[in-house]
Design a protein with these regions (language model features):
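TRNA-recognition modules of translation machinery and tRNA-sensing kinases, especially anticodon-binding
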Residues: 1-114
Length: 114
């Protein structure tokens, strides 16, 4: 078996010298969001598949071709998040974040999997 020495197609490594630039951009974006009244939300990397079927649409390319879905030990269908909005809305509803009135101003910095 050949030693794997290259990142998978479509991915990149963010190495020293580049990571500092990314950190600076993230810090500026975070500061701007918070100065404008947004709060950070962090949601799980995976969600119940039905959440994405209902929010993205069960006949879209995302659902039909671009989601990484598997069954957990309990037989439930779980999907790595292909986007962030559905999980953020689910968390907002589940945790009653809308009780303080509207608008609910949230931001997230996440990895998505397609």
């Amino acid at each position: 078996m050949e030693l794997i020495t290259k990142a998978p197609k479509g991915t990149v490594d963010i190495i020293p010298g580049e990571s500092e630039k990314w950190s600076l951009v993230e810090a500026v974006m975070t500061d701007e969001a918070e100065l404008n009244g947004f709060s950070e939300i962090r949601t799980p990397v995976f969600e119940h598949t039905e959440l994405f079927l209902r929010s993205v649409g069960d006949t879209t390319d995302v659902v039909e071709k671009q989601m990484y879905t598997f069954e957990d030990k309990g037989g439930r269908s779980i999907t790595l998040r292909p986007e962030g909005t559905a999980g953020a809305v689910r968390a907002m509803l589940e945790n009653g974040l809308y009780n303080g009135g509207y608008p609910v101003k949230l931001y997230y910095k996440i990895s998505c999997y397609r």
